[in-house]
Amino acid sequence: MKVTSLSFPYGESIQWFSPERADSIQNAQLKDWLLATGSLTLKLKNLCNDFEVKVLGEQLTSPLATDTMIEETVWMREVLLCLDGTPWVFARTLVPQSLLDFKSQAFTQLGNKPLGELLYTSPEIIPGKIELAKFDTCSRLAKLATSLKQEISDPLWGRRRHFSIDTRHLTVSEIFLPAAVAHMKLHNK
């Protein structure tokens, strides 16, 4: 795998849309995965022997213009979720500075632990709405998939979910890489 910290961040300006417009997603299994409300981490772990989080980078930064729910400095973390050594999902987390001041250790010291375990096991964290996005084959994330030796023949699809802790919001974006989509098509899961 030729991903280095010099490549960080991969995130780009994204046009998110509501799940009501998900009819354009032809792959029914992918659509189900995109709209699933439970923990993606748990779902992925059930499909493999070795689940791994590979951190691409993390840092304090300004949010992108498309991250409208967050208007302050954010802690950004970008990772690959790998199943049996193969990257399946690119994930990007944005945690606002005010939430870091409130719960810094929970987020900044995850290391290679999946964030999903914290998000779906902590009663104070409330999952919010899901939004979807389509990434053309020339996007930065498609180039990431190519650098991971995954062939890009169709656009990539991803989802973004907002989570609330008190009055603060964090955002998690998950983009399904070609290896995940190929598995879904093959195994109908």
Curated annotation (Swiss-Prot):
Its EC number is 4.1.3.40. GO terms for molecular function: chorismate lyase activity. One of its GO terms (cellular component) is cytosol. Substrate binds at R77, L115, E174. It is an enzyme of class 4 (lyase). It comes from the Bacteria. It catalyses: chorismate = 4-hydroxybenzoate + pyruvate. InterPro entries: Chorismate--pyruvate_lyase, Chorismate_lyase_/UTRA_dom_sf. It is found in: Cytoplasm. Pathway: Cofactor biosynthesis; ubiquinone biosynthesis. One of its GO terms (biological process) is pyruvate biosynthetic process. Removes the pyruvyl group from chorismate, with concomitant aromatization of the ring, to provide 4-hydroxybenzoate (4HB) for the ubiquinone pathway. Belongs to the UbiC family. This is Probable chorismate pyruvate-lyase. It comes from Shewanella denitrificans (strain OS217 / ATCC BAA-1090 / DSM 15013).
